[in-house]
Amino acid sequence: MGGSILFFMKMNNNNILILKHLRNNARKNFSEISRETGIPVTTVFDNYQKLRKNKVITKHSSFIDFRKIGFFYRNFVFVKSRNKKELLSYLDDHKNINSVFRISTYDYLIDAIFPTMKEFYIFLDELRNFNIQKLEHHDVVEHIKKEEFFNE
């Protein structure tokens, strides 16, 4: 068994409570988590450090309403390419790509965010340089539920 599997098996209720509080609000400090859970603050701190060390917690970030900063066009792009390595490098460097997922059926699911539809279609034209076998894209009309798993 891998190290992360063993760590998961050792997860106790304290760790689960800490994770749920951080998923709900990553800016919550250890004292607040301690007060709300009844877990001693030193235990919260120690467990947090272990969760980071074992890469259970990998990053803290903020949710942004992209429309309020001028990015009005969001699209999910499904792509299958003969040039996977080059395509992935291009996507990794592209400033308008929020996330890339490796998926079945297609190679990648791309979460693309652009100021305008025109700029998005320029991006689609650029993708065709990577020997695309299959491409499908869908407009995001409304983001209804955002990062709610494991945060009760």
Each language-model region and where it sits:
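A compositional/biophysical signature of low hydrophobicity enriched in polar/charged and small residues
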Residues: 1-152
